[in-house]
């Protein structure tokens, strides 16, 4: 392969790696790959039609954001957070998100409120359709967009990563997707934000996290090897 062809191939490989990364991350965050699920390089390489080296790079990226755990001689599996880690994740989210509310209130404008209302509507529709992955996605997006109003990209990135790990916690400890965030909680938060009521808003957000943690059942079921061919159908051709 000459230099010109190498230059053309590099972006294509990067795009493929990113596509696989996003597909696996979405499957993990939306509970299609439960905590503890094995992620064999050979099986994933076959499904995505790439080399094991390519899959290994993606798994290392997922491990860097703590969605995948890499164990020597045992390979990769979806991270299964402990009780202590699970509680710490939600405690950290509560501290960060509540502390950021003054900046959220200060910068909030009607278009922000409309965007949050739209997310709640889509979340409610997902619940009514029993679409667990969509409900999880919209619930996380609500919190991320709420915090993004503050204009603090560093904190928003932290909330995004913690929201992904929160999804793992809910999947790991037996609370069905419908027992995570509640639409009526989110609606209450928007109402208090509209009123610029900092103290009630802070208390409501803290209570919201308390409710999520209280809904968890800290007992773990066994896991089996997922059907990767079904789960990622269509990615081989992309």
What do the PLM-derived regions correspond to, one by one?
Residues 15, 113-114, 177-181:
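Short helix-capping and inter-helix turn/linker motifs at the boundaries of alpha-helical repeat units
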Residues 1-102, 106, 213, 217-238:
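Short linear motifs at protein or domain termini
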Residues 28, 104, 127-128, 150, ...:
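Hydrophobic residues in alpha-helical segments
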Residues 177-238:
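C-terminal regulatory/effector modules of DNA-binding transcriptional regulators
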Residues 85, 89, 110-171, 183-191, ...:
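Conserved amphipathic alpha-helical segments that form helical-bundle/coiled-coil interaction surfaces
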Residues 64, 68-69, 162-164, 178-180:
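Mobile beta-alpha loop/short-helix "lid" or hinge segments that flank ligand
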Residues 104-108, 150-154, 158, 170-177, ...:
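Long, hydrophobic, amphipathic alpha-helical segments used as structural scaffolds
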């Amino acid at each position: 392969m000459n230099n010109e062809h190498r230059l053309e191939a590099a972006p294509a490989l990067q795009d493929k790696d990113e596509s696989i990364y996003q597909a696996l991350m979405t499957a993990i965050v939306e509970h299609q790959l439960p905590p503890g699920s094995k992620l064999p390089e050979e099986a994933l390489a076959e499904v995505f039609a790439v080399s094991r080296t390519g899959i290994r790079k993606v798994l290392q990226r997922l491990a860097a954001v703590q969605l995948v755990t890499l164990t020597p001689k045992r390979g990769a599996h979806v991270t299964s957070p402990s009780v202590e880690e699970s509680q710490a994740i939600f405690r950290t989210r509560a501290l960060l998100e509540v502390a950021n509310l003054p900046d959220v209130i200060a910068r909030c404008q009607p278009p922000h409120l409309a965007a949050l209302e739209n997310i709640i509507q889509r979340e409610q529709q997902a619940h009514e359709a029993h679409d667990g992955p969509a409900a999880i996605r919209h619930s996380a997006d609500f919190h991320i967009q709420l915090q993004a109003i503050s204009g603090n990209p560093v904190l928003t990135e932290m909330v995004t990563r913690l929201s992904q790990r929160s999804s793992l916690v809910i999947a790991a400890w037996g609370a069905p997707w419908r027992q995570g965030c509640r639409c009526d909680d989110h609606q209450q938060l928007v109402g208090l934000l509209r009123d610029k009521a900092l103290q009630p808003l802070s208390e409501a957000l803290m209570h919201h996290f308390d409710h999520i943690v209280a809904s968890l059942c800290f007992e773990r079921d066994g896991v089996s090897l997922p059907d990767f061919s079904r789960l990622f159908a269509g990615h081989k051709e992309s």
